[in-house]
C-alpha cells in the first residue's frame, strides 16, 4: 500500500471587527482572525496537510493570498476543492487529526460542529476526523491572546495501490 502522511500548520492574528470562524463554525467572540480569506486557521492547516501528503505543494500555491478571487473566500469551499484535487491526483483521504491552540475563547463547545463540517467537506465518516483544542498556558503570543494557531495531520492512500 502506498500511504502518504501530510502535516499542516497555520496561524492568524486576532483583530477586532472580524468574525471568528474555526472549522467552518462561527464562534461568538469580540475578535476574529485577520486574513485574505475568512482566515479559518483550522481548515487552512488541514488543507496544507492534504496538499502536502499528496506532494501537491501548499495552500498558497493553489489559493494565493494575492489573488482577488480568494478575497474573503469561504475556507470550506477551498477545503472541498483541495479534496477534489487530491482525489484527482489518485489519492483517497483516510483520516485527519488536528489541534487548535487558542488561549480564548473556549472551543470545546464547538468541536462537534467543526468535526461535522470537516467530515462533510472531505466526504469522510465522522470517526475519521478529530479536532482537539488546547491553550498555550498563557505563554508567548498565543498565550497573550494575540492569535490562534492550528496544526493538522492527514493520511492518504494511493487509489488502487
From Swiss-Prot:
Pathway: Isoprenoid biosynthesis; isopentenyl diphosphate biosynthesis via DXP pathway; isopentenyl diphosphate from 1-deoxy-D-xylulose 5-phosphate: step 4/6
Top enzyme category: lyase
Keywords: Isoprene biosynthesis, Lyase, Metal-binding
Cofactor note: Binds 1 divalent metal cation per subunit.
Highest rank taxon of the organism: Bacteria
Gene3D superfamilies per record: 2-C-methyl-D-erythritol 2,4-cyclodiphosphate synthase
EC annotation from Swiss-Prot or TrEMBL: 4.6.1.12
Residues holding 4-CDP-2-C-methyl-D-erythritol 2-phosphate: 10-12, 36-37, 58-60, 63-67, 144
Marked site: Transition state stabilizer: 36, 135
Molecular function, one GO term: metal ion binding
Protein family per UniProt: Belongs to the IspF family.
Quaternary structure annotation from Swiss-Prot or TrEMBL: Homotrimer.
UniProt protein name: 2-C-methyl-D-erythritol 2,4-cyclodiphosphate synthase
Organism of derivation: Burkholderia ambifaria (strain MC40-6)
Highest classification ranks of the organism: Bacteria, Pseudomonadati, Pseudomonadota, Betaproteobacteria, Burkholderiales
Amino acid at each position: 500500500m502506498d500511504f502518504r502522511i501530510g502535516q499542516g500548520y497555520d496561524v492568524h492574528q486576532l483583530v477586532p471587527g472580524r468574525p471568528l470562524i474555526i472549522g467552518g463554525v462561527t464562534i461568538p467572540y469580540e475578535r476574529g482572525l485577520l486574513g485574505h480569506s475568512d482566515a479559518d486557521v483550522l481548515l487552512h492547516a488541514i488543507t496544507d496537510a492534504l496538499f502536502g501528503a499528496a506532494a501537491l505543494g501548499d495552500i498558497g500555491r493553489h489559493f494565493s493570498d494575492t489573488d482577488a478571487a480568494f478575497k474573503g473566500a469561504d475556507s470550506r469551499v477551498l477545503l472541498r476543492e483541495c479534496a477534489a484535487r487530491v482525489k484527482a491526483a489518485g489519492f483517497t483521504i483516510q483520516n485527519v487529526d488536528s489541534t487548535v491552540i487558542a488561549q480564548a475563547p473556549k472551543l470545546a463547545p464547538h468541536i462537534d460542529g467543526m468535526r461535522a463540517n470537516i467530515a462533510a467537506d472531505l466526504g469522510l465518516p465522522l470517526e475519521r476526523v478529530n479536532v482537539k483544542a488546547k491553550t498555550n498556558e498563557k505563554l508567548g503570543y498565543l498565550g497573550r491572546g494575540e492569535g490562534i494557531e492550528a496544526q493538522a495531520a492527514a493520511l492518504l492512500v494511493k487509489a488502487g495501490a
